[in-house]
Amino acid sequence: MNMKKKEKHAIRKKSIGVASVLVGTLIGFGLLSSKEADASENSVTQSDSASNESKSNDSSSVSAAPKTDDTNVSDTKTSSNTNNGETSVAQNPAQQETTQSALTNATTEETPVTGEATTATNQANTPATTQSSNTNAEELVNQTSNETTSNDTNTVSSVNSPQNSTNAENVSTTQDTSTEATPSNNESAPQSTDASNKDVVNQAVNTSAPRMRAFSLSAVAADAPAAGKDITNQLTNVTVGIDSGDTVYPHQAGYVKLNYGFSVPNSAVKGDTFKITVPKELNLNGVTSTAKVPPIMAGDQVLANGVIDSDGNVIYTFTDYVDTKENVTANITMPAYIDPENVTKTGNVTLTTGIGSTTANKTVLVDYEKYGKFYNLSIKGTIDQIDKTNNTYRQTIYVNPSGDNVIAPVLTGNLKPNTDSNALIDQQNTSIKVYKVDNAADLSESYFVNPENFEDVTNSVNITFPNPNQYKVEFNTPDDQITTPYIVVVNGHIDPNSKGDLALRSTLYGYDSRFVWRSMSWDNEVAFNNGSGSGDGIDKPVVPEQPDEPGEIEPIPEDSDSDPGSDSGSDSNSDSGSDSGSDSTSDSGSDSASDSDSASDSDSASDSDSASDSDSASDSDSASDSDSASDSDSASDSDSASDSDSDNDSDSDSDSDSDSDSDSDSDSDSDSDSDSDSDSDSDSDSDSDSDSDSDSDSDSDSDSDSDSDSDSDSDSDSDSDSDSDSDSDSNSDSDSDSDSDSDSDSDSDSDSDSDSDSDSDSDSDSASDSDSDSDSDSDSDSDSDSDSDSDSDSDSDSDSDSDSDSESDSDSESDSDSDSDSDSDSDSDSDSASDSDSGSDSDSSSDSDSESDSNSDSESGSNNNVVPPNSPKNGTNASNKNEAKDSKEPLPDTGSEDEANTSLIWGLLASIGSLLLFRRKKENKDKK
């Protein structure tokens, strides 16, 4: 029994094993047959697709597509996304990505489902089902062709028209339920959708036929840019133009307009591209950090989007707008800006741009304009970069681009006054770099700066932020001055909440060569053009109001209007106390260099009208020591005109001690024309005391030509008291030639009072060479009132070496009215040595009119002792001279008077004279 159980167990075990083997075998054959069916379906689909392409090339089917195709397609796309979701749930994760893209392509062949089915399937979507495969999308785009466009059109037409039997046959080859499905059958629609989806999945795994219309617009935007064909050379009716003036000012927001027009071939599809060649001398961003090109718009639809490649050219990519349109035309206008890196200097530039083989060119003058300069201060700046995404800007400033010498230079930067500038200037938002430029020629006029080419001296300068929205840069050079240019680069921030534009002012301060504190400013602004988001700076130099105090820095400089031609500078060292009133009109042309240190105390009132033109060259070395005391009261009225030509050579050494008291009134009228050439060497020692009172009226006219060579040694001591009144009218014509050698000893004492009125006209031409030694010490107190009208033209050349020691004490009061016209040219060379001690008190009044013409040639030698002044001038002395010349014998004895009375009288007179003489000398000494 147990054995039966065992047997039954064995038999059941065996039967179960046989059944398992049979079931497994059947399943294996089923799987194999399924794979064969898949391969068959694929091959059928490909052949059918080929037939579809050949059939869909009919142009009538293309034009038959109504505008409602887009609506139907979007419905199909919605269904496609739903199907993707359902299918992907049943698929392996490894196949999900490929399946989604394949289904998207295949759904164009489906029949539209009903609204009920669509709603139901949309609710079944998951996040994973909405994703598209970038890889499959790119593959499909790469396989796009003109045939595909026609095929898509046919496909869209078939969606709207279910009478297209070709697609139905393709589906029925593998699935009958797909063919039987109709839009009106609401119940069978979901089944049809499921069945067709399964078949489409099997087809799409290996299907490569592109179906671009299956992409939604949002999907294209999310994917990488489509890689279509370059149809640049297929564009027709291409026009290219460059719109600009003959001169472009980049730093005045100047730019160039590039204009293009063309027609798009009907064969163009979404993803196709064309290229616009932009010259390297231009860029499309201006000062913005990123360049953008305008999209080509067709109403409110985008026809093509553009990007800039690495070479600066523009690549436009067509959207699906061209898939549904024919005879598409387009026009483009782009603002372009001079590229500062490729065009660094002012000059002519030829610009060439085009589309394909159609080009246009134009030669323009690029003018960067010069920096602003005011005296020795020069500055210019530009805003060369703006980033509105990060709210930053960069400003480049050239400091002292002229390379002048600026003492104690200081640069400040702040917001431009009277503007709503959006810049933020403070230590947290502003970074400053300073570079030194060794040679001004290394600066580019475009303000393109490569920092590697210059020395970074940021750590050597002093950068502070002394006031809100202001920075300050002090150039701490060893000698506190700069002679080379500097580049200051400011990286700042923009206030994103501000509605204003970027507007900055840079100001350079410093001393000029005359140590006058000056300033020069430069303003920068930004302009935007045609919605491109790009632009450049508006630059203009500004001469601000000059600082009042040296070293003063305006916290926030205001707008100012100053006169750039103003220049003031003074350098003086003086100590003076004066009380003067003057009314003068002068016209002078002089070239002088003087260094003076003076202390004066004067009280003068003068009214003068003078016009002088002088050219003088003097070389003098003088040392004077003089001791003089004078008390004079004179009133003179003179009118003189002189014309003299003299040549003097003198060498004098004088030591004089004089005490004079004179009261003179003179009126003289003289006309003299003299030409003299004298060479004299004299040594005189005189002590004279004279008291004379003379009144003379003389009218003389003399013309003399004399040549004299004299050597005299005189020692005279005279005491004279004379009162004379003379009225003489003489006319003399003399021709003399004299050679005299005289030795005289005279002692004279004179007291004179003279009144003279002279009118003279002189014209002199003199050249003098004098060597004098004088030592003078003078103390003068003068009160003068003079009214003079003089016109002088003098040309003098003098070389003097004098050493004088003088001491004088004078008290004078004079009233003079003179009118003189003199033209003098003198050349003198004198060498004299004199030692004189004189005391004179004179009061004279003379009126003389004389005319003399003398020519003398004499040679004389005399040794005489001067007799008292009362002796006649033409008496014995004259005969003695002649006789001494002819004979050296002593004078004959004329005898003597023995009368005692005569001797006594002369003795008394001599005693009285001596007493008077010594008394006068004593009085003179007391006065001193």
Curated annotation (Swiss-Prot):
Record localization: Secreted, Cell wall
PROSITE patterns, A to Z: GRAM_POS_ANCHORING
Region (Disordered): 34-199, 528-899
Annotated signal peptide: 1-39
Annotated positions of the Pentaglycyl murein peptidoglycan amidated threonine modification: 894
Propeptide cleavage-removed residue intervals: 895-928
Highest taxon, organism lineage: Bacteria
Stretches with biased composition (Low complexity): 47-65, 117-131, 142-161, 565-597, 857-875
Residue stretches of biased makeup (Basic and acidic residues): 882-891
Compositionally biased residues, Acidic residues: 546-564, 598-856
Stretch list, region Ligand binding A region: 40-542
Pfam families in alphabetical order: Big_8 (PF17961), Gram_pos_anchor (PF00746), SdrG_C_C (PF10425), YSIRK_signal (PF04650)
Renumbered ranges of motif LPXTG sorting signal: 891-895
Chief location: secreted
One record GO biological process: cell adhesion
InterPro entries: Adhesin_Fg-bd_dom_2, Adhesion_dom_sf, Fibrogen-bd_dom1, LPXTG_anchor, SDr-like, SDR_Ig, YSIRK_signal_dom
Function: Cell surface-associated protein implicated in virulence. Promotes bacterial attachment exclusively to the gamma-chain of human fibrinogen. Induces formation of bacterial clumps.
Similarity annotation: Belongs to the serine-aspartate repeat-containing protein (SDr) family.
Protein name: Clumping factor A
Species assigned in the record: Staphylococcus aureus (strain MSSA476)
Lineage of producing organism: Bacteria, Bacillati, Bacillota, Bacilli, Bacillales
